[in-house]
Design a protein with these regions (language model features):
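Intrinsically disordered, low-complexity Pro/Gly/Ser/Thr-rich segments with frequent PxxP/GP/PP motifs
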Residues: 94-134, 590-616
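Short aromatic-acidic-glycine turn motif
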Residues: 76-100, 153, 584-594, 629-632
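Membrane-proximal extracellular "stem/stalk" segments
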Residues: 513-516, 523-648
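Active-site beta->alpha N-cap acidic-glycine motif
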Residues: 157-160, 164-274
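Secretory targeting and sorting signals
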Residues: 2-29, 657-668
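Asparagine-centered strand-capping/turn motif at beta-strand->loop junctions
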Residues: 59-67, 567-572
Length: 689
């Protein structure tokens, strides 16, 4: 840029920042802390042009405890536009007076009258093009509304007591089209409490019902072109809404009517339909704290496996597919984290521009970052109107997209290699309101300089590389104690599922338990998160302890071979398949494992184990339960001794000989008795004669 032109731009910017005002009024309002909010609800035209009349409508709400009288709304706009993004950012950083000149011509402002505490009034201002007094140069004009009023002391300041700002582009035809798109995040706003139920069931139901935040956001998103939208889905939201419908994890005493369940079902069906329309990006279940996982590599693998299982199970249940994506917190990105998240290289990571200090809009919103493990895509979020006064609305979103696109296409005129675009991601907590249709968001994608583009199509194109540094993370991740408790859930759950033949439902439920305590949300209440994780770990261990094994206190064999009983008890609610393995204190003796057997829920089974001591006299055995994959699980039985009597054979021989002697004696005695009887019968009788 030439020096004279630079001086002109600086002078114009200074003029904007100076803000022309009406002289002769006090510099500051008597009320030092006016508390009013302003929302722009409609703005036409969406693109400025000669001959058009700028019409802006919206609402102003008084949050003060006193009334404001003689309230008026004025349109404000500067004489010259911004032509680069850096000009916009500099102006915003320098304060909120950058909007421009207040239009005070008769008939261009709105008299609202008095505004009582907590009262909301609508405003409408109309200013013909000629009365805007603008230069007509191409660029982006900040345009807004300023609210003036008289306080309870009767004093009226020339300073606005409230304001709202958006942007209005003026771009002629013939410019290059740039990619324009919106990312719509749908996150689970609720969490499970200490007892396993959702802590705010009524709040979740309100969000997904008609007029609720998530319902309004979905309706707005569904109204946009498939080519210009990308759904960012948290599977925990799908599961949570489905739980509402089925009455699962609902606190005792909370009863949902059939109509309420129908509202939740409609939301779930509509969200799935929207996500399937253009393909979606899918977060890990409950948006996990990936920084905490990366900082604890010894725990990362089992925890990540559980999160993946919970995610996959939800996607399978709801027949949804999408590209895996990670979303760290705003200031929770490091180069090592990106390395760990790289995976196969096709899973994007969402980061803010603050995480990439050397990033510039000319690189585009989707860039390639090279890690030691290979390249990966990053989606960089950078909101044009961050920090401007006023509440977010559909109109400000529309104007943000149009203005980003206008600045991008103007940049390409002087920088043909620029990849600047107009991709934006809305705040997942934003409520566009039930009157979202009045904002006409679709107009953002009808401009001659915008090209509706999905993020999936962006990833199929060559990406520019970001070779700069990654900022240091300042966010505090979840504690190691919380991760260790989650790892104990994994360990106990893995052991339990290994003995359940049909364990998919059990595995999925345990995976959800793990994922539910690893979300970024727990950073705000780490103590509660850790306590819940420990409780879930204890419950998983308690369930495993319901499967027990009992052995006799001691066993004495009459020979080197014999058997002894082992009893397995299953007090869980699931049928199990489990075997038995033995540890012997005598290294020369090995007891064969008992093959797995099926035991029904609430049943017990006693089996006989055969043993051959061979030449050994005794051994101490410890019985362990064994899963079908050969791993020992649960607590072993108490150790017991098995002995073999060395005189066993002698005893049997002696007993045999004794029996023979007894038998011989009986035979001999019987024979003698028979002979005496025979002799007596053969002797002649004595003759008396």
């Amino acid at each position: 840029v030439s020096s004279p032109r630079r001086r002109v731009l600086v002078a114009l910017l200074a003029t904007i920042l100076a803000t022309l005002t009406v002289p002769g009024l006090p510099a500051h309002a008597a009320d030092k802390n006016p508390q009013l909010s302003v929302s722009i609800q409609s703005l036409s035209p969406s693109r400025l042009g000669p001959g058009s009349t700028v019409t802006m409508t919206g609402t102003v709400t008084n949050h003060n405890g006193h009334a404001w009288t003689n309230v008026q709304a004025y349109l404000v706009i500067p004489a010259v536009p911004f032509t680069t993004r850096s000009q916009v950012e500099d102006a915003i950083d320098n304060g909120d007076a950058y909007t421009g000149v207040r239009v005070v011509d008769a008939g261009t402002f709105d008299d609202l009258g008095d505004l009582a505490p907590k009262q909301t009034r609508r405003f409408s201002v109309k200013v013909p093009y000629d009365q805007l007094h603008i230069s007509g140069a191409e660029g982006v004009y900040p345009v807004g509304v300023q609210i003036l009023g008289t306080d309870t002391g009767g004093e009226r300041s020339n300073d606005a007591i409230a304001r709202a700002t958006t942007f209005l582009p003026l771009v002629s035809g013939g410019h290059q089209r740039v990619a324009a798109s919106v990312v719509w995040p749908f996150l689970m706003p609720n969490r499970r409490g200490y007892n396993g139920d959702y802590v705010d069931t009524t709040g979740l139901l309100r969000d997904v019902s008609a007029g609720g935040q998530l319902r309004n956001l979905l309706d707005l998103a569904s109204s946009t072109s498939d080519k210009a939208s990308t759904a960012l889905i948290d599977p925990a939201l799908l599961v949570g809404v489905d739980d509402l419908i089925r009455g699962h994890r609902v606190p005792e005493g909370v009863k949902l009517t059939p109509e309420q369940k129908a509202e939740a079902q409609r939301f779930l069906d509509d969200l799935l339909a929207f996500a399937r329309r253009q393909g979606s990006w899918v977060l890990g279940f409950d948006r996990p704290d990936v920084l905490a996982l990366s900082n604890n590599p010894d725990l990362e693998t089992p925890l990540k496996t559980a999160i993946d299982r919970a995610t996959d199970a939800a996607l399978t249940k709801f027949q949804l597919y999408g590209r895996e994506v990670s979303w760290p917190s705003m200031h929770g990105v490091t180069s090592s984290l990106l390395r760990d998240l790289r995976g196969s290289g096709d899973s994007p990571v969402i980061v803010t521009s603050d995480a990439l200090p050397s990033w510039d809009r000319r690189l585009g919103s989707v860039v390639q970052y090279v890690t030691p493990n290979g390249p990966m895509p990053l989606l960089v979020t950078d909101v044009l109107d961050a920090g401007v006064p006023g509440q977010d609305s559909v109109v400000t979103l529309r104007q943000r997209i149009l203005s980003e696109a206008a600045l991008a296409t103007l940049q390409r005129e002087i920088d043909p290699k620029s990849r600047a675009d107009a991709i934006t991601m809305v705040d997942p907590r934003w409520n566009p309101g039930p009157q979202w249709a009045a904002g006409r968001l679709s107009a953002a994608f009808e401009a001659p300089f915008t090209s509706p583009t999905s993020l999936e199509s962006m990833l199929t194109r060559p990406l520019t590389s970001y070779s700069g540094k990654v900022a240091a993370a300042t966010d505090r991740p979840l504690s190691r104690a919380q991760l260790k408790a989650a790892a104990r859930i994994v360990a106990s759950g893995s052991a339990l599922s290994s003995v359940i033949p049909q364990s998919d439902e059990v595995d999925d439920a345990l995976a959800q338990d793990v994922a539910s305590v690893l979300g970024i949300r727990w950073r705000e209440s780490p103590g509660t998160g850790t306590a819940i994780a420990k409780k879930l770990a204890g419950e998983a261990g308690a369930e495993l302890r319901k499967i027990t094994i009992k052995a006799p206190s001691s066993v004495t064999l009459s020979s080197s071979k014999g058997g002894f009983p082992i009893t397995i008890r299953n007090d869980t609610g699931e049928a199990i398949r489990v075997g038995v393995t033995f540890d012997s204190s005598n290294p020369a003796l090995t007891v064969p494992d008992v093959k797995p057997i099926d035991i029904g829920a609430g049943e017990r089974h006693t089996l006989t184990v055969d043993i051959d001591l061979g030449r050994q006299n005794a051994t101490s055995l410890t019985a362990h339960l064994k899963s079908t994959d050969g791993k020992t699980i649960g607590q072993p039985a108490d150790p017991f001794n098995v002995r073999s009597s060395k005189i066993g054979v002698v005893l049997w021989v002696a007993m045999g000989l004794a029996a023979l002697l007894v038998l011989a004696a009986l035979v001999r005695r019987f024979s003698r008795r028979r002979r005496r009887t025979r002799v007596a019968s053969e002797r002649p009788a004595d003759d008396d004669d």
